[in-house]
């Protein structure tokens, strides 16, 4: 029986693909070597210890239907579209070795007539007239008996959108968490205009087989039928949840301020695990009572636009004469925390 396993996803859903990856990693025998090939439609993928409000333009992502996905490995934030090819190599210890998987990807690129080299801990770069340019970034995860290396290759990604979603709004955010390092990148189509996702997957697969001296049939993973993976439904539910993607952010503070015709408002939030642990409101409004009441209501509230809006609008029952001010406040807060 082969010790290799090759899986190819036909889904572009980042939560589905990351849930598949997690399930395979947890249940694979320690003697198995796995290659998983996949890609995501418009998604910002953040590292396990990152703060999405710090890393991403969450408001623009929501407007453009770009998903947020938190992965289980460390590292920085990346934007995925269908111009990216994603790969995951898994193996049990002591055989797990990220230099092996890196060399497999380099061999695959070489077979496609792309001369690339490893740079730093995580990147693959190519030489261009403008200097070295990154075409691949990676992240890693290890447990006591196994490890994985996953990464992306930029084929024909819309690089302008990287800046759209990975440059966060200039919010007054004092946040802990790992900040992403921005690198100069290029697409492989700059070197090979006709290159496709299918060609890259085939090249990586062949390099994988060549390294281990074995071949195996590909398993196609599809959301049309629930994958036969232990605990997949629960893993997918967690991977797609707000609590995981946003709520796992490290503790941070957020300061919001705005001047309305009826007065200035300053809000101070402390947020832990996606919940407001402390809310302070300062205002020069002639009637501060609704804002003082709001501070009390927001304690323990989920740090989510719809929940904050709900708490603002709940005050209309007690302060109906200030409906105009409260609706303005509600709309502003909801926009400011997206």
From Swiss-Prot:
Reaction(s) catalysed by this chain's protein: L-lysyl-[lipoyl-carrier protein] + (R)-lipoate + ATP = N(6)-[(R)-lipoyl]-L-lysyl-[lipoyl-carrier protein] + AMP + diphosphate + H(+)
Positions with a binding annotation for ATP: 71, 76-79, 134
Gene Ontology cellular component list: cytosol
Signal peptide as annotated in the record: none
UniProt keyword annotation of Ligase present: yes
GO molecular function list: ATP binding; lipoate-protein ligase activity; lipoyltransferase activity
InterPro entries membership: aa-tRNA-synth_II/BPL/LPL, BPL_LPL_catalytic, Lipoate_ligase_A, Lipoate_protein_ligase_C, LipoylTrfase_LipoateP_Ligase
GO BP annotations listed: protein modification process
Localization per record: Cytoplasm
Annotated metabolic or biological route of this protein: Protein modification; protein lipoylation via exogenous pathway; protein N(6)-(lipoyl)lysine from lipoate: step 1/2; Protein modification; protein lipoylation via exogenous pathway; protein N(6)-(lipoyl)lysine from lipoate: step 2/2
Keyword Endoplasmic reticulum: no
Alphabetized UniProt keyword annotations: ATP-binding, Cytoplasm, Ligase, Nucleotide-binding
Any Pfam family hit: LplA-B_cat
Residues reported in the UniProt entry to bind (R)-lipoate: 134
Residue ranges occupied by any BPL/LPL catalytic domain in the UniProt entry: 29-216
Documented EC number(s): 6.3.1.20
Source organism superkingdom: Bacteria
NCBIfam families: lipoyltrans
Primary role: Catalyzes both the ATP-dependent activation of exogenously supplied lipoate to lipoyl-AMP and the transfer of the activated lipoyl onto the lipoyl domains of lipoate-dependent enzymes.
Oligomeric form and interacting partners: Monomer.
Protein family (similarity comment): Belongs to the LplA family.
Misc. comment: In the transfer reaction, the free carboxyl group of lipoic acid is attached via an amide linkage to the epsilon-amino group of a specific lysine residue of lipoyl domains of lipoate-dependent enzymes.
Name the UniProt record assigns to this protein: Lipoate-protein ligase A
Native organism: Escherichia coli O127:H6 (strain E2348/69 / EPEC)
């Amino acid at each position: 029986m082969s010790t290799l396993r090759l899986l190819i996803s036909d889904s572009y859903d980042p939560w589905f693909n990351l849930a598949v990856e997690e399930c395979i990693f947890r249940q694979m025998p320690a003697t198995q070597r796995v290659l998983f090939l996949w890609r995501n439609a418009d998604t910002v993928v953040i590292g396990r210890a990152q703060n999405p409000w710090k890393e991403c333009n969450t408001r623009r992502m929501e407007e453009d239907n770009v998903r947020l996905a938190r992965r289980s490995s460390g590292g920085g934030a990346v934007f995925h579209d269908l111009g990216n090819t994603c790969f995951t190599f898994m193996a049990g210890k002591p055989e797990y070795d990220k230099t092996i998987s890196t060399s497999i990807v380099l061999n695959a690129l070489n077979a496609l007539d792309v001369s690339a080299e490893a740079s730093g801990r995580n990147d693959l770069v190519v030489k261009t007239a403008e200097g070295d340019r990154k075409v691949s970034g990676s992240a890693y995860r290890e447990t006591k008996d196994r490890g994985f290396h996953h990464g992306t290759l930029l084929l024909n990604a819309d690089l302008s959108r990287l800046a759209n979603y990975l440059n966060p709004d200039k919010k007054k955010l004092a946040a802990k968490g790992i900040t992403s390092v921005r690198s100069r990148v290029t697409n492989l189509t700059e070197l090979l205009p006709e290159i496709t996702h299918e060609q890259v997957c085939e090249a990586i697969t062949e390099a994988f087989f060549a390294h281990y001296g074995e071949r195996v049939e590909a398993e196609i993973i599809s959301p049309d039928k629930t994958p036969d993976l232990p605990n997949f439904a629960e893993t997918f539910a967690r991977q797609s949840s707000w609590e995981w993607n946003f709520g796992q952010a490290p503790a941070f503070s957020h300061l919001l301020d705005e001047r309305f015709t009826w007065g200035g408002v300053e809000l101070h939030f402390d947020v832990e695990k996606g919940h407001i642990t402390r809310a302070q409101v300062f205002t020069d409004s002639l009637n501060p009572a609704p804002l003082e009441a709001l501070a009390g209501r927001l304690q323990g509230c989920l740090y989510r636009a719809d929940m904050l809006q709900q708490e603002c609008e709940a005050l209309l029952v007690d302060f109906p004469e200030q409906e105009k001010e409260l609706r303005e406040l509600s709309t502003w807060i909801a926009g400011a925390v997206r």
